[in-house]
Amino acid sequence: MADKKKERVDFTPAPLKSKKDDERYTPAGAVVRMEIICTQALEEDFLQEFGEQKVAARYTKLAGVMGAGYSNPCLGDAIWPQLNVMFIVYCSEADCEVIKNIVWKLRDKYRTEGIACFVSRAEEV
């Protein structure tokens, strides 16, 4: 029986010169990450505004978010039974401005409800 050498196969992909060299890459134009945290009571209002303003068509929603900010705590317990909801949106600078206006509008409309909004830079990889 002949002695066969096993060849080692390298599965490491060749380095890409740029994102555009990767056929899986689809530029989404997302440059801003927005985190919006509000009481669950405002969830429908945000979704309605997103639809009317045609922004945040793609978002991540985290339900049952607990925390304490500048309004009443939302801890989901016997003392503070309410909970928050959190939206994470990746969007363009222009959509970010529209969403900020939605946040300000709902803050004016619901002055006693907690609404937090954080904006940071994002890069799709």
Q: What are the functions of these language-model segments?
A:
Residues 1-125:
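Positively charged, small/polar-rich N-terminal and surface patches that mediate targeting and assembly
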